[in-house]
Amino acid sequence: MTTLRVLLHVAAHRDYELHSLDFSTAFLQGSLHEEIWLRRPPGFTGSFPSGTQWSLRRPVYGLRQAPREWHDTLRTTLAALGFAPSTADPSLFLRTDTSLPPFYILVYIDDLVFATADTAGLAYVKSELQKRHMCTDLGELRSYLGLQITRDRARRTITLTQSHMVQQVLQRFGFTYSSPQATPLSTRHSLSALPSDESVESSGPYPELVGCLIPEHMAAAKRVLRYLCSTSGMGLVLGGRSPVVLTGHADASWADDQATQRSSQGYTFSLGSGSVSWRATRSSSVLGSSCEAEIYAGAMAAQELRWLTYLLTDLGEPPRSPPVLYVDNKAMLALCREQRLEHRTKHIALRYFLARELQQRGQLRLAYVASEANTADVFTKALPPCDHQRFCTQLGLVPVLPHLLSS
C-alpha cells in the first residue's frame, strides 16, 4: 500500500492519467511448467478405467504454484510491451524506453493501476493486454483495494477514503448509530495480557471483531468502532502543486508496556502533503533508556527512508537534498552527531545506528523537533482528543464533503 500511496502522490502532482484494469480468473491464465498429476474427481462419469491419473495442463485456484505462475506470465507480457519491474518494488513496472513519456503500472495480483501522461500509449497497452488476456478495462481509477479515490485536478490532489468499508464494519457489529469517540484509545485505559490459566471465550463477537481471545479488551475494541463511526468521513489527501520532498518523523515511548516494560516505536513519512508511509511497533526486548528507544525508532525509520529514496528514484523524483528525519530526543541526536563510546550505549547493536551512518554519508539529515510537534507521537501512545486530532491533521487527514463520499 505504501507504493500505491507514493505512486498516487506523484501521479497527482504531475497530473497524470490514472486508470485501472481487472483480470478475470487470473490464476487460470498462467502457464504451468511442472508436471502435476491428479486423481479422477469424485462423481465423474467419463469413460476412464478405475485409477486413471489426469495431467494438469493449466494452473487452477488452490494450486501453490498458481500465484507465481500468473505473476511470471503477466511479467512476460509486460516485458513484451516494454516494461520492467522496479528495483525497489517488483510489483511496480516502469517503461524502459526513456525517449517516451514515463509510464508506470502497479500490479496487485489481478488488479492493475496505470499512471502516465501518454494517453495514446495508455490506450495501446490496455488494448494489447485485452488481446492477450481476459480482462476488463475499468476506466479512470475510482477505487482500489477497498480505497475510494477522488481527484481534484485543479489542485492536483487525490483524496483516499474508506467510508464504505467502515460503514460495512459498523453495520456488521451493530455500531452504525453508536456514540462517536474522538480517539481510538483512552489515555486512562490500561490494557494487560490475559493470564494463561484463565479460561477464554472461543466464539462470539469479540474473536470475530479483533481476531484474538482477550475478552478484557472488549471495551477497547468497541471504542475503536465508535472512533471509526466518528471518522468515517475523513480522507487522506495526497499530491499537490508543491515539490515532492521526502520528510519523516520518528518517535518512541519508553517502557510503556506495563506487563513487559518494552517500548513502542513509530514513524511517518510524507512527500509534501498527506502521509504515504507509517508504522507502529513494539520493541523485541527491554531497552535501558528513552535514548535507546529513540535510537531503535530512528533505525526503523532510516530503513524505510532509504527504501523510499529508491522508490522515488525509480519514479523520477530522487531527493535533491538529504531527506530530513525529525526526532524529539536530544541525547539520540548527540550520539548520532559524534561516534563515540558511551558506557550506557556501548551494548546497543551497531545495526541500530543506521540513522547515524546515513547522516554521515549525506543520505539523511537528523533534526530536532519538539514533542508536541512530532507527528510520529500519535503512533506510540494514546493521546488526549485535542492532540490526537492535531496530529491527524498533520498526517493529512481532513473531513471529506458528503457528495464526494457518495460518489
Label every PLM stretch briefly.
Residues V245, T281-S407:
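RNase H-like nuclease module associated with reverse transcription
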Residues M1-L106, D111-M134:
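Metal/cofactor- and membrane transport-associated sequence elements
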Residues L7, D22, L38, G62, ...:
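Mobile genetic element proteins and their domesticated derivatives, centered on retroelements
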Residues L7-L8, L138-G235, A370, V378-T380:
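C-terminal reverse transcriptase regions that engage the nucleic-acid substrate
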Residues L81, P85-A88, V113-V166, L170-Q171, ...:
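Polymerase palm active-site segment centered on the conserved acidic dipeptide of motif C
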Residues F23-S31, L112, A252-T260, A331-L333:
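Short acidic, Gly/Ser-rich segments with clustered Asp/Glu that frequently serve as metal-coordination loops
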Residues A11-D15, R226-A252, E317-P319:
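Structured nucleic-acid-interacting core domains from mobile-element enzymes and related host factors
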Residues L213, G248-C291:
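RNase H-like nuclease fold core
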